[in-house]
């Protein structure tokens, strides 16, 4: 581990090279939007909302998985980044059934907060209106796949903190979904300890108590 000096949004900053740019930015009060990141869990770079511009690199890089390097020049905000983040929120909103007025997470939803923060006033792309399962088989909790944004927080907190390994990811692309056990009803999965950690970390109304 060594100390490097880099520039973030015009500020010269020292950081350890085993940190992520997201950690470095947070330490210095620079806010970067995220959806899949959660302190204490390993980062997967799934939501792509924390993308940054790095001078000399044509591709945008995820702050949660990129390490600082000596002399690196980073921009966390620009017209290009704001447009990109707003488009991601648009796609997330259109791919699921996110009807805020009737959602249990209305008023405390991270997706809703990000839409407001990025200035998203309306969704320009067609809504898919998918018909997804609502799993109410668990005695204490409900999983509404219509509002899942595939951040995988539930999967990671169940694996890394609780050690129950109840949740997993199945399929790819638009068919990708979170499954319990071997694609069973949640209430039938013996590994679930009913701890509620997955519900606590869900950023939307996909997981909620009965």
Task: For the regions a language model picked out, list residue spans one by one.
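Fe-S ferredoxin-like electron-transfer domains
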Residues: 48, 57-191, 200-210
């Amino acid at each position: 581990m060594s100390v490097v000096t880099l520039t973030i949004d015009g500020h010269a900053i020292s950081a350890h090279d085993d940190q992520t740019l997201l950690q470095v930015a947070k330490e210095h009060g620079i806010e970067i939007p995220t959806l899949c990141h959660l302190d204490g869990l390993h980062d997967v770079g799934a939501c792509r909302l924390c993308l940054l511009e790095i001078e000399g690199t044509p591709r945008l890089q995820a702050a949660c998985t990129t390490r600082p390097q000596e002399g690196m020049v980073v921009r966390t905000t620009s017209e290009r980044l704001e447009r990109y983040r707003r488009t991601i929120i648009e796609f997330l909103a259109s791919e699921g059934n996110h009807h805020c007025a009737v959602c249990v997470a209305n008023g405390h939803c991270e997706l809703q907060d990000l839409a407001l923060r990025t200035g998203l006033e309306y969704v320009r792309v067609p809504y898919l209106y998918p018909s997804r399962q609502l799993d109410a088989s668990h005695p204490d909790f409900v999983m509404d796949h219509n509002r899942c944004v595939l951040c995988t927080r539930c999967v990671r907190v169940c694996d890394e903190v609780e050690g129950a390994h109840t949740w997993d990811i199945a399929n790819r692309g638009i068919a990708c979904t979170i499954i319990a056990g071997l694609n069973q009803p949640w209430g039938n999965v013996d590994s679930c300890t009913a701890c509620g950690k997955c519900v606590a970390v869900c950023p939307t109304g996909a997981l909620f108590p009965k």
